[in-house]
């Protein structure tokens, strides 16, 4: 992973090029240094105790329109997005192998070890109209951490690459249903009339994609916990800083600390 300006962190582990075909959408955020060293097990244990409101607010914190909505509006939108993800997962065969589902959808799935020529860590990526890439080095590192840190009891035994692929399948679904699916059709007015500019809320697709992946793979926790786990495989300090940022939402009464 390329470290830039001390502590810049890739804050969304799934790549998605629906917004601009052929280009990676890499969102970076300046992170504070972690306050203290923490074990990966303790961080995972705490993250698993957080309720959906924390994860929805975390997703919103990455959205360019975050400052235009109240907390209540963000949570309401988050609930609707999660419901959208669940509903779309229900339309597919639950419990089926996600790789078989991808094949039935006519997708071209490639599994290189790392991105070619990229300086940032990308874990998975969808390129319109039908190409998905899962970068296996990051999945391998995460699986090794699960084994070495004895996290199976917390995270289960679902392969990390399956969860990555499932999330990208939602973005494929978004593309194919862009005229009807909630995460694509819901827009907000940014300018007052007569100068109209209606914009999509990007984080809704990420919230829905996480819930879609959870339902489709049957994992017992939100895939959002993999943000910290997979970053830990490359940079322990950056992962700990990200954990503390997420935990702060719960500390502000925006979730339960457990």
Report residues per predicted region.
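Alpha-helix initiation and capping sites
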Residues: 92, 126-128, 155-159, 163, ...
